[in-house]
Amino acid sequence: MPTVKQLIRNARQPIRNARKSAALKGCPQRRGTCARVYTINPKKPNSALRKVARVRLTSGFEITAYIPGIGHNLQEHSVVLVRGGRVKDLPGVRYRIIRGALDAVAVKNRQQGRSKYGVKKPKK
């Protein structure tokens, strides 16, 4: 235990909480380049082939980001916009790719929840 004199000389540092999306460096989104696009299996009890991409961000981090929606056009060297938000059944996936921005096209034939998949309002 430190003495009073030691505490005066060097005050105690508060314990800082770890950020949930450190790779974004406090920004709402970050641009990045796909290094690899592949599928992974979710944790039990779920079963699927979830589409993910390994993305090298402008902040220097290389992260794994989820590709939401049905079907995508992403491949290696695609430029994407990444936001925070984990995928509960994929361990280590703490980011999502924004559909309809940069090289990631919007989901086709989407009628509901369009804003989450970059789909414009359909013409009447």
UniProtKB/Swiss-Prot annotation:
Its main location: plastid. One of its GO terms (biological process) is translation. Coiled coil: none annotated. One of its GO terms (molecular function) is rRNA binding. The keyword Nucleotide-binding does not apply. HAMAP family: Ribosomal_uS12_B. NCBIfam families: rpsL_bact. This is Small ribosomal subunit protein uS12cz/uS12cy. It comes from Oryza sativa subsp. japonica (Rice). The gene is rps12-A.
